[in-house]
């Protein structure tokens, strides 16, 4: 089965107990990798900059559709203190463009402003639900 995912990849800096950790984040990364684990063919509609380690996606054989941007990747800083969490946007990448591809399903999971109403309408119009 073919799955199209529309979401930004992100870079997250997590601050916890005086230490900082950097990792990939965003629904695009997690949904894409998990869908491949379930043997879906994945087309990922996303945007990221040259600062994003895209090998995490390509080594899972995720098809990247018009994904590279001249801007840096969307980035969040996440501070964790006990049960409290603070999330700060540090950078916002380009919005995602729509491209039509044959898919059995679509996941639209924006993390911050990357899906315009026009793009969402085109996704819905191209879906069979």
Please annotate each region the language model reported:
Residues 8:
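Active-site glycine-centered loops adjacent to acidic/histidine catalytic or metal-binding residues
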Residues 3, 11-22, 37-128:
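Conserved N-terminal subdomain of the carbohydrate kinase-like
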Residues 26-37:
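Histidine-anchored nucleotide/phosphate-binding helix
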Residues 2-5, 25-27:
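Short hydrophobic/aromatic-rich motifs at helix boundaries and adjacent loops
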């Amino acid at each position: 089965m073919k799955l199209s995912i529309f979401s930004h990849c992100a870079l997250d800096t997590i601050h916890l107990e005086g230490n900082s950790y950097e990792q990939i984040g965003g629904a695009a990364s997690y949904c894409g990798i998990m869908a491949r684990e379930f043997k879906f063919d994945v087309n990922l509609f996303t945007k990221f900059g040259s600062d994003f380690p895209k090998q995490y996606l390509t080594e899972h054989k995720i098809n990247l559709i018009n994904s590279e941007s001249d801007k840096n990747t969307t980035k969040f800083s996440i501070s964790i203190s006990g049960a409290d969490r603070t999330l700060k946007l540090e950078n916002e990448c380009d919005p995602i463009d729509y491209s039509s591809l044959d898919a059995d399903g679509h996941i639209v999971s924006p993390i911050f402003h990357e899906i315009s109403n026009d793009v969402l309408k085109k996704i819905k119009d191209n879906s069979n639900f």
